[in-house]
């Protein structure tokens, strides 16, 4: 764990693990909604194939449900966009550290994903701070644990939220 000067650029933030993980979550949510919408669109047509009026009513019900589900998806997307905007707006206020990712745990919220706990020195006090659960071997995962386990990374510590954001691996 080495504290260093925060020379991170906005381009590095936009290419960071943290930023791209959130972008990937948004894409997964959109694809999931499109998949549900596409498959469920077939139901009104399959059920009411003999009546035009029933097809119209089925389509109206389908459309209402997709708006309802889309509202929840939209709230989640806004959450991720807000987190990325927060990072872009405040990254210069965070302390930069070079750490080794060697202590991991399984996330409860993101099943099958892992997060790392890093030990940093902040204002003279040692702290154990968690990253977000970026890493997984699942199909839709952008970052796999093998690429980062026991590797040195540069990250930013947000003392307000007590979070450690992984920016990039050190070569």
Label each residue range with its predicted role.
Residues 2, 11-90:
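Alpha-helical transmembrane spans
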Residues 2-5, 170-171:
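Short, charged juxtamembrane terminal tails flanking transmembrane helices
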Residues 51, 84, 88-96, 123-128, ...:
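Exposed regions on extracellular, virion, or secretory-pathway luminal proteins
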Residues 89-112:
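Structural detector for short beta-strands of small beta-barrel domains
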Residues 98, 115-119, 154:
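Beta-strand secondary-structure signal
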Residues 102, 119-121, 167:
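A structural detector for beta-sheet-dominated domains
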Residues 109-134:
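OB-fold (S1/OB) nucleic-acid-binding surfaces
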Residues 130-171:
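A membrane-cytosol interface segment of integral membrane proteins
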């Amino acid at each position: 764990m080495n504290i260093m000067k925060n020379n991170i650029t906005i381009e590095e933030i936009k290419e960071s693990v943290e930023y791209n993980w959130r972008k990937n979550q948004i894409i997964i949510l959109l694809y999931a909604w499109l998949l549900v919408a596409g498959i469920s669109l077939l139901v009104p047509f399959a059920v009411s194939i003999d009546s035009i009026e029933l097809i119209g009513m089925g389509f109206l019900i389908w459309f209402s449900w997709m708006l309802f589900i889309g509202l929840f998806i939209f709230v989640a997307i806004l959450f991720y966009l807000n987190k990325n905007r927060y990072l872009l707006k405040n990254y210069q206020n965070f302390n930069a550290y070079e750490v080794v990712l060697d202590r991991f745990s399984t996330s409860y919220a993101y099943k099958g994903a892992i997060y790392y706990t890093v030990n940093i020195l902040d204002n003279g006090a040692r702290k154990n701070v968690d990253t977000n659960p970026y890493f997984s071997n699942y199909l839709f995962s952008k970052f796999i644990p093998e690429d980062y386990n026991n590797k040195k990374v540069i990250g930013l510590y947000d003392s307000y939220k007590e979070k450690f954001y992984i920016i990039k691996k050190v070569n």
